[in-house]
Regions:
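Conserved AMP-binding A3 loop
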Residues: 81-86, 216-218, 225-252
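Conserved AMP-binding/adenylate-forming core of the ANL superfamily
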Residues: 71-122, 142-152, 200-205, 242-245, ...
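Gly/Ser/Thr-rich phosphate-binding loop
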Residues: 202, 290-292, 310, 319-322, ...
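Conserved ATP-binding/catalytic segment of the ANL
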Residues: 425-485, 623
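Conserved structural elements of the adenylate-forming
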Residues: 89-95, 207-210, 221, 240-261
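Conserved ATP-dependent adenylate/AMP-binding module captured primarily in the ANL superfamily
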Residues: 141-177, 209, 250-269, 302-319
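Conserved AMP-binding/adenylation subdomain of ANL enzymes
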Residues: 248-267, 274-343
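Conserved pre-ATP/AMP-binding loop-to-beta segment of ANL
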Residues: 66-69, 186-188, 192-229, 236, ...
Length: 627
């Protein structure tokens, strides 16, 4: 999974209101050009020293601010259950002692099936302290998947020695079907019929080993800290090796770039899943490294889920806020309508950060307007470029030039290499935050690095100013998604996709671009049901079939598609036919991740009949045609 924003031709709306000043380490690079067209970007500022192991920072804060809240979660739907830095350290040492006694290792790691929680964090940091890798898995693999295909695959790939799910009752079917009889199951509570289940409380009650400090001291920069799963074009998970060096170096990169983190410990209200690098490395690591406090948000940017996020933000004022574009879009109407929420949200907010897709100009400008209304200034909106394989922080914008589609420059410690590739500039990365490889997949690992040891992200960039690369770079799509029309003309999918979504707002959440070896480009459209209800308020909240057939929705989409066609500059940007898809994208088939990222290739493969329908000589009524 890449954590980059998609490109967008639509600029952020101009504003005369001031930008809140924040401490920020603007990246500046030295540039080297080779005769073959390859360009190297090397940050002028060297990376500062970083610790050997992430638990060194846990020791630091447990000593200097032992009673500060590290993490809090809702308890019984009302108050907050909190754990301090001192309590986290103590629990980690007990759990580590229990894990070491079990002989767990990289060959027999800990696998965590359930989502974000304090208990999840306790087990994860216990594994960190023991030097035993752990792997957080998307709960959807256990609770949404119908055939457990991905879960079964990764169990064979990882061969865990202990599998944890906070609620054993909830995960019982998945545990029974996928965890071998010789593998230990652990849980905070609940049962699995026919299986013994170790309680987390028992793990936490393990006496601290006499040699624990010695074992902990042997953890080095190359010790595997965790595995994070990412899916390729096949949809089968790859386990990205995350070493202590990667995680620790990346946190120093973050702290030196987002320098306002040094001004005061961050307070974060966060829902982003820990099985992804954005939530699990970037955010939880940023909290720990800088002595901050993370309030776990059980909400999500979906109908029936955003209300919990709103409730949490009505109580807790974040100093920095992280989300995906859909999260900001879902939050926007509540911020607009509730002055109390707006005041609480912007009260001490230094910056916002988005990743995963393009943030629409409408949403961005609206957030600016609300901040100005409340505080008299705009709050910086930040983004960048990264991937699971880069831990993830690799490139960053600066607050003054930030806009959707802009990814800035490589941060200290990272060298970027730009390689000509079919008329684009493919970006590659080298630094201490880059993975050593994929676990037990040497062939895929070898193909992921070039002859100089640069990791191939698969992304393309283009300079904002070809004469001044220090002006930064814009995202220019995924190299593997681009294709040729029958005429031989290249279609740049990433930028086209972002422009299409922006032009069809608020109706469209995402789009799959089709047209390989065809005469023209067409689209399979993923509707945004919230946006559709803005067009027709009578629509049900969760009926995709009704929405795709609704007359008002189809007319509104046709109008937007017609305008989009009118702005086309050639065959590679002309979309004349589209189908509004009436079945959800499938996690089992690898069409979409649990965070909502679409695998274009998988959708095109599994929905080939829809593609044929788009290009039929006599298209069906489902096809919306213009031009």
């Amino acid at each position: 999974m890449s954590a980059q924003p998609s490109s967008s031709s639509m600029e952020r709306g101009a504003s005369t209101s001031p930008l809140r000043p924040i401490s920020f380490g603007d990246p500046v690079v030295n540039i080297e050009r080779r005769d073959d067209g390859t360009i190297y970007l090397r940050p002028k500022q060297p990376l500062g020293d970083y610790p050997v192991r992430i638990t060194d920072r846990l020791h630091h804060w447990a000593t200097t601010t032992p009673d500060r809240v590290f993490m809090a979660e809702r308890e019984g739907g009302r108050g907050w259950r909190k754990i301090s830095y001192a309590e986290l350290l103590a629990a980690s040492r007990h759990i580590a002692s229990g894990l070491i006694a079990r002989g767990l290792s990289a060959e027999r790691p800990v696998v965590i099936l359930s989502g974000n929680s304090i208990d999840h964090a306790l087990l994860a940091f216990g594994a960190h302290y023991a030097g035993i890798p752990f792997c957080p898995v998307s709960p959807a693999y256990s609770l949404v998947s119908k055939d457990y295909g991905k879960l079964s695959y990764l169990m064979k790939l990882l061969t865990p020695g202990l599998v944890f799910a906070e609620d054993a009752d909830k995960f019982a079917d998945a545990l029974a079907a996928n965890v071998s009889l010789g593998t230990e199951i652990a849980a905070s509570y609940g049962h699995v019929p026919g299986r013994d289940v170790t309680s987390l409380a028992d793990l936490m009650a393990t006496p601290i080993r006499g040699d624990l400090d010695e074992v902990h001291g042997k953890i080095g920069p190359d010790t595997i800290a965790k595995f994070l799963l990412t899916s390729g074009s096949t949809g089968n998970p790859k386990a990205v090796i995350n070493t202590q060096r990667m995680i620790c170096a990346n946190q120093v990169m973050l702290r030196e770039t987002l320098a306002f983190l040094k001004d005061e410990p961050p307070v974060i209200v966060d829902w982003l899943p820990w099985n992804h690098t954005f939530g699990g490395n970037h955010n939880i690591g940023l909290t720990l490294y800088n002595g901050g406090s993370m309030y776990l948000d059980a909400g999500k940017p979906v109908p029936g889920g955003i209300e919990e996020t709103v409730r949490n933000l009505q109580e807790i004022s974040p100093t920095v806020y992280f989300n995906v574009p859909k999260g900001y879009e879902s939050l926007l109407p509540y911020l607009r309508d509730d002055q109390g929420l707006r005041a609480k949200f912007f009260d001490r907010l230094h910056a916002m950060f988005f990743s995963g897709a393009a943030l629409s100009p409408f949403v961005w400008n609206s957030l600016d307007e609300l901040a100005v209304k409340e505080k008299g200034y705009r709050v910086p909106m930040l983004t960048g470029l990264g991937a699971t394989e880069t831990a993830p922080f690799f490139m960053s914008v600066n607050p003054r030039t930030s806009r959707s589609g802009h990814v800035g420059l490589p941060v200290s410690g990272n060298d970027a290499k730009l390689v000509p590739n079919n008329g684009k500039m493919e970006v590659r990365c080298k630094g201490p935050n880059v993975m050593p490889g994929y676990w037990r997949q040497p062939d895929i690992t070898a193909k992921s690095f070039d002859e100089e040891g640069f990791y191939k992200l698969g992304d393309a960039l283009k300079p904002v100013d070809p004469d001044d690369f220090n002006a930064g770079f814009d995202f220019d799509g995924r190299i593997g998604e681009d294709f040729k029309l029958g005429s031989g003309t290249w279609v740049s999918v990433g930028p086209l996709r972002a422009r299409f979504v922006a032009a069809c707002a608020p109706l469209v959440r995402d789009v799959v671009i089709a047209g390989i070896n065809r005469d023209e480009v067409s689209a399979l459209v993923v509707l945004d049901l919230d946006g559709c209800r803005l067009i027709n308020p009578t629509l049900p909240a969760d009926d995709l079939v009704v929405a795709t057939r609704d007359r008002l929705v189809r007319e509104a989409f046709r109008e937007r598609l017609t305008r989009f066609l009118g702005a086309a500059t050639g065959s590679s940007t002309r979309i004349t036919r589209a189908i509004l898809m009436d079945t959800p994208l499938s996690i089992d088939k690898g069409e979409v991740t649990d965070k909502g990222s679409i695998n274009q290739r998988a959708v095109l493969e599994h929905r080939s009949l829809l593609i044929e329908e788009l290009y039929a000589a006599n298209p069906s009524d489902r096809v919306i045609s213009v031009g």
